Amino acid sequence: MTIDEIYQMYMNDVYRFLLSMTKDKHLAEDLLQETFMRAYIHIHSYDHSKVKPWLFQVARNAFIDYVRKHKKEVTISDDLIGSLFQNAVQSPAHQVEIKEVLTGYMSELPDNYREALTLYYLKELNYKEASHIMNISEANFKSVLFRARQRLKALYNRGVNDE
C-alpha cells in the first residue's frame, strides 16, 4: 500500500482523532500533516495488516510531542462524554447540562484515562488496537478503561451530590 492510498483511506479518521484531542481545527490539520510526513518517512517499518493502529500511533506521538513542546492542556470532546452517560439521561436539556459538567471533570482525569476513553468510545477501536496505540497490554488497557469509567462516574456523582 502506498502512502497516497493510506492517506486517502485514513486521512479523515486520523483528522477526527487529532481534532478530538486538540479541539482546534488548525492544530489538528498541522498535526495531520506531521503524522503523514512521519508515516512517509517510516513507511517501510509498519505491518501492512495493521495500518490503522500504526497510523493512530504515529498521530498520537505527534500530538504528544506537540503537547510536550507547548505545555498545552488538551481536553476530550463533548461527544465522547455524552455517549458515556447517554443511557442515564432522560431529557435533552439534562443531557446538555451533564455534558458541560463532565467536560470539566475530564480535565481532572489522568492523561492515560482520557486517552483510553477517546480511543475506545470516540474512535471505536477494539481493545487490541487501542492497547497497541497506548503501548500497553490488552489486559492493562481493559483495566485502565475500567478505572477511567469509574473515576469519571465518581467525579460526576460527587458533583451531583454536592449540589
Swiss-Prot record:
Q: Where is this motif: Polymerase core binding?
A: 30-43
Q: Does the keyword Ribosomal protein apply?
A: no
Instruction: Supply the induction statement.
Output: Forms an operon with yhdL and yhdK, maximally expressed during early to mid-exponential growth phases. Transcription decreases during late exponential growth; positively autoregulated. Negatively regulated by yhdL and yhdK. Induced by 5% ethanol, 80 uM paraquat, pH 4.3, the antibiotics, inhibitors of cell wall, bacitracin, vancomycin and phosphomycin, heat shock of 10 minutes at 50 degrees Celsius. No induction was observed with pH 9, H(2)O(2), monensin, and the detergents Triton X-100 and Tween 20. Induced 3-fold by the beta-lactam antibiotic cefuroxime.
* A single GO molecular function term of this UniProt record: DNA binding
Effect of knocking it out? Strains insertionally inactivated in the sigM gene form aberrantly shaped cells that swell and lyse in medium containing high levels of different salts. 70-fold increased sensitivity to the beta-lactam antibiotic cefuroxime (CEF), double sigM-sigX mutants have 130-fold increased sensitivity to CEF. Also sensitive to other antibiotics.
Ranges annotated as DNA-binding: 127-146
A single GO BP? regulation of DNA-templated transcription
Keywords, A to Z, come to:
DNA-binding, Sigma factor, Transcription, Transcription regulation
What does the record give as the function of this protein?
A: Sigma factors are initiation factors that promote the attachment of RNA polymerase (RNAP) to specific initiation sites and are then released. Extracytoplasmic function (ECF) sigma factors are held in an inactive form by a cognate anti-sigma factor (YhdL) until released. This sigma factor is involved in the maintenance of membrane and cell wall integrity in response to environmental stresses including salt, acid, ethanol and antibiotics stress. Partially regulates transcription from a number of genes including disA. Associates with RNAP core under all growth phases.
Family statement: Belongs to the sigma-70 factor family. ECF subfamily.
Q: Can you state the subunit structure given in the record?
A: Interacts with the N-terminus of YhdL, which is probably its anti-sigma factor. Interacts transiently with the RNAP core.
Question: What name is this protein filed under?
Answer: ECF RNA polymerase sigma factor SigM
Q: Which organism is it from?
A: Bacillus subtilis (strain 168)
Organism phylogeny = Bacteria, Bacillati, Bacillota, Bacilli, Bacillales
This protein's gene is called: sigM
